[in-house]
Amino acid sequence: MARELKLGYKASAEQFAPRELVELAVATESHGFDSATVSDHFQPWRYNGGHAPFSLAWMTAVGERTQRLQLGTSVLTPTFRYNPAVTAQAFATMGCLYPGRIFLGVGTGEALNEIATGYIGEWPEFKERFARLRESVRLMRELWTGERVDFEGEYYRTQGAAIYDVPEGGIPVYIAAGGAVVAKYAGRAGDGFICTSGKGEELYSGKLIPAVREGAALAERSFDDIDRMIEIKISYDPDPDKALENTRFWAPLSLTPEQKHSIHDPIEMERAADELPIEQVAKRWIVASDPDEAVEKVADYVGWGLNHLVFHAPGHDQKRFLELFKTDLEPRLRKLG
């Protein structure tokens, strides 16, 4: 049985202050959204005009003021500045407070957030970061059983550790992947899979989704048991000039992974991003002023196998986006399911 189509809102913690970010997420429940996800940055992409509220405080604030909205991180790194055992405790508590609504989205991490908070030495290559992620997920899942856990891993250890307040069934873990190796792991071990838009059909239909399928098959799981989430970067506005200009704040996302890998200072990140022309920045986004055109481009991702569409709008006027989403996009998007 195919997964149901879900529509989500990306709460841009790098762009908005804590109170505004909470109010926007609360409003999504009456504007056609099923979920709200939040980024987890210690530092923003931009030094000037940037923000970085604490994701878990945001989740509890939104959880208290909503009734059905699914809430999660997209994504948190439970391996460096966060201890995985403490991360497991935090999400277990939220799972008890908001039953069936909390998930933990995880990734391998970025230097921008970890070096400033005390990581010593050269920033690890992917192999180590991925190994840490896998080990942390194993540990957290053991702790969510509620039993005492003695864990001896390569990176993490616990002695008689137990989480005393755990929701039934634990917490769903969504694994973010930009390539086939981690996507295969998501299919094998994740309750959900997360990727981002704007990188070409071959990545999604030729690499990521087949890898998720392969991982699921190896674990003797159903592909349809995995919630397949994509953050869709969309700048929709009836005014085409505004739709294009709104993407400028998020120029750092258009830097290559190689460019971003070693940058750990938001001032340097901002400088590198602002050297990019607006045309290059906009390539990562669906930039549209016609709702049918916008939804037609979104429909490609559904056709490639994604079912949980989380919309990241780049403009500063998010209330305008929520209204446009409700009137222009949501009715059309629901027909994709």
From Swiss-Prot:
Binding site residues for coenzyme F420-(gamma-Glu)n: 40, 77, 108-109, 113, 178-179, 181-182
The enzyme's E.C. designation: 1.1.98.2
Catalytic reaction list: oxidized coenzyme F420-(gamma-L-Glu)(n) + D-glucose 6-phosphate + H(+) = 6-phospho-D-glucono-1,5-lactone + reduced coenzyme F420-(gamma-L-Glu)(n)
UniProt keyword terms in alphabetical order: Carbohydrate metabolism, Oxidoreductase
GO MF terms held by the record: coenzyme F420 binding; glucose-6-phosphate dehydrogenase (coenzyme F420) activity; oxidoreductase activity, acting on paired donors, with incorporation or reduction of molecular oxygen
Record-linked InterPro entries: F420-dep_G6P_DH, F420-G6PD/mer, F420_G6P_DH-rel, Luciferase-like_dom, Luciferase-like_sf
Catalytic-site annotation from UniProt: 41, 110
UniProt-listed GO biological process terms: carbohydrate metabolic process
Residues binding substrate, per UniProt: 196, 199, 260, 284
Gene3D superfamilies recorded: Luciferase-like domain
Pfam families the UniProt entry points to: Bac_luciferase
Task of the protein: Catalyzes the coenzyme F420-dependent oxidation of glucose 6-phosphate (G6P) to 6-phosphogluconolactone. Appears to have a role in resistance to oxidative stress, via its consumption of G6P that serves as a source of reducing power to combat oxidative stress in mycobacteria.
Assembly with partners or alone: Homodimer.
Family indicated by similarity: Belongs to the F420-dependent glucose-6-phosphate dehydrogenase family.
Name of this protein: F420-dependent glucose-6-phosphate dehydrogenase
Species annotation: Mycobacteroides abscessus (strain ATCC 19977 / DSM 44196 / CCUG 20993 / CIP 104536 / JCM 13569 / NCTC 13031 / TMC 1543 / L948) (Mycobacterium abscessus)
Lineage: Bacteria, Bacillati, Actinomycetota, Actinomycetes, Mycobacteriales
